[in-house]
Amino acid sequence: MYTGIIEAVGTLSLIEKRGNGAFVKVMTPASFKAKERVKIGDSVASNGVCLTATTVGDDFFTADVSAETVAMTCFKFYKQGQRLNLELPCTPATHLGGHIVQGHVDGIGEIKDISPLGEAVNIWVSNPPELSRYIALKGSIAVDGASLTVNSVTDDSFRLTLIPHSQTVLAFENWQTGRKVNLEVDVLARYLERLVLGQKFQSNAEEKSSALSFETLMQNGFI
């Protein structure tokens, strides 16, 4: 489990196709202290994707990326030199500065517009329609692994505002109009839907439409 508070930005120095999956090598900055903090078998969130370290050096780690992960995430688009937001799993003593992030990408979004707002920037991101019901105004969403606040929503997109600090600590140089990004919705929204509706969803992508509404939440004592 992660918090979406990015610890460092690494660089994808190698991505090698292996069957339908891939093998990757990620270079890390000295401040990340890879060899000291990462052990073989540990998980490292890389642009929001949970990767298991297979080898670790002073300034790098390697990982195998499964065929499903390649298919379901932006790793299918990545090339050598791609910058990656990195975060190690939280512990019981970790300050939860963001929100609960699992490192399990729910879908791929696309940056539709970037516009300045003083020193900040507004970013509109389109999302797969099946995720819209989990994205709420002033709620949290993980974008490329970073816990960010939703400031506006439409039927198929949402707006983020990145303050100067966020632009500095994230792999913000990746974010351009048309760029694909990994999205993970707040897992609490998914659990709430299941608890309130008592509804079994299909395990595939063709989930039923949600009946979750403001009235349903009130009737079940959540509001």
Listing of model-derived features with the role each one plays in the protein:
Residues 1-223:
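Conserved loop->alpha-helix
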